[in-house]
């Protein structure tokens, strides 16, 4: 999965955010990124907060473990997931992205 990388001991995820969507959720792949749809508008950091909350809930980690590393004001972002390796992140995202070969690994 080209959208997952490593920064120190933590995993990083490259995402493409679509704010003001009709519903919040992970929409699948978008090139070499994961597309995330958010109801929030990109005002007062609301979309970034919602994005981190969604990813934390999806991965089953505390919200404080997920942060925006790059792209605070851009649709393309890099999110850091503390305490999770890239392989753990791959396994956790596989069912959501429909990649069964990774889910069973």
Curated annotation (Swiss-Prot):
Superkingdom of origin: Bacteria
One GO term describing the cellular component: cytoplasm
A Pfam family it matches: DUF167
SMART domains in the cross-refs: DUF167 (SM01152)
Name recorded for this polypeptide: UPF0235 protein Cpar_0370
Source organism of the structure: Chlorobaculum parvum (strain DSM 263 / NCIMB 8327)
Family stated for the protein in its record: Belongs to the UPF0235 family.
S-S pairs: none
